């Protein structure tokens, strides 16, 4: 993998674009493990976001029935089309945050770090069986954090409300070219059964975690505008907010179920839709 990536960089005089988060994975064993964790069948369709120079794409193409690879950089697309002769790979040019994803079973990607958050929230709106994704380590740690942890955040809540998530491998920065400033990690996500998924009001979760170390009721009072309340509304509803369930807990201690309790209370009191 190392020699393949560097031969292509040399051949095409390619300068990785830091604005697009181009840090190419160059360690074959890491790529092999990422593909193995996806447990790909030849009948399945795989989505890859940011194929880079195609080394992961090539391994996916050997196993899957179909691979959709979304790439924003026209230079990279030209290289992929010249260097590979895939019959089951469709390269889609565009911004992964803006285009509608095709139907897919699984998603396997070394994600551009600067779109980690929005692309994760977008993926959670799609039906898939498994996701094997490489993230910046700190972001991955937030995804798996539990109530009370220092990394527990809005991201932790919104992800774990929908999927089972595991951090399965830490990757040193030397596994990439150019070498990033931070380590990375492999995350595996599998959606929970529909009856176990919890739908949460995103504005409420944002309002709470805007002040993650404050008591739940105080956090909501300080972020009332994020709930769509005017100052006059807030004066009217302040006594109700003070009575929210779990008001004696700090936000970073709230479980997903606790947050759902707060949401249902506020909805019953007509504070949120």
Curated annotation (Swiss-Prot):
Single GO molecular function: RNA binding
GO cellular component: cytoplasm
First-level EC class: transferase
Domain of life: Archaea
Keywords: Cytoplasm, Methyltransferase, RNA-binding, rRNA processing, S-adenosyl-L-methionine, Transferase
Entry EC no(s): 2.1.1.-
Subcellular localization(s) per the UniProt record: Cytoplasm
Entry-linked InterPro entries: KsgA/Erm, rRNA_Ade_diMease-like_C, rRNA_Ade_Mease_Trfase_CS, rRNA_Ade_methylase_Trfase_N, rRNA_adenine_dimethylase, SAM-dependent_MTases_sf
Residues involved in S-adenosyl-L-methionine binding: 23, 25, 50, 71, 95, 110
Phosphoprotein in keyword set: no
Family, similarity comment: Belongs to the class I-like SAM-binding methyltransferase superfamily. rRNA adenine N(6)-methyltransferase family. RsmA subfamily.
Function as written in the Swiss-Prot or TrEMBL entry: Specifically dimethylates two adjacent adenosines in the loop of a conserved hairpin near the 3'-end of 16S rRNA in the 30S particle. May play a critical role in biogenesis of 30S subunits.
PANTHER family: DIMETHYLADENOSINE TRANSFERASE (PTHR11727), DIMETHYLADENOSINE TRANSFERASE-RELATED (PTHR11727:SF7)
Protein name in UniProt: Probable ribosomal RNA small subunit methyltransferase A
Natural source organism: Thermococcus sibiricus (strain DSM 12597 / MM 739)
């Amino acid at each position: 993998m190392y020699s393949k990536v560097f031969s292509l960089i040399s051949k095409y005089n390619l300068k990785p674009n830091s604005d697009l988060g181009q840090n190419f994975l160059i360690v074959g064993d890491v790529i092999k493990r990422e593909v193995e964790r996806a447990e790909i069948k030849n009948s399945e369709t795989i989505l890859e976001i940011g194929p880079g120079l195609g080394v992961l794409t090539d391994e996916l193409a050997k196993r899957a029935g179909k691979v959709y690879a979304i790439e924003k950089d026209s230079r990279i697309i030209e290289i992929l089309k010249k260097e590979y002769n895939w019959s089951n790979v469709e390269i889609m040019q565009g911004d992964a945050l803006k285009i509608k994803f095709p139907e897919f079973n699984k998603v396997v990607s070394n994600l551009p770090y600067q779109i980690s958050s929005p692309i994760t929230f977008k993926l959670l709106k799609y039906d898939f069986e498994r996701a094997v994704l490489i993230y910046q380590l700190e972001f991955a740690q937030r995804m798996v954090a539990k109530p009370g942890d220092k990394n527990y955040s809005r991201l932790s809540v919104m992800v774990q409300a929908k999927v089972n998530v595991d951090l399965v491998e830490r990757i040193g920065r030397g596994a990439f070219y150019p070498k990033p400033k931070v380590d990375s990690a492999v995350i595996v996500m599998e959606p929970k059964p529909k009856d176990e998924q919890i739908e949460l009001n995103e504005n409420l979760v944002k309002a709470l975690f805007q002040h993650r170390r404050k008591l739940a009721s105080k956090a909501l009072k300080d972020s009332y505008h994020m709930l769509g309340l005017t100052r006059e509304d807030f004066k009217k509803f302040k006594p109700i907010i003070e009575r929210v369930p779990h008001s004696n807990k700090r936000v970073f201690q709230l479980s997903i179920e606790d947050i759902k309790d707060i949401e249902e209370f506020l909805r019953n009191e007509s504070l949120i839709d």
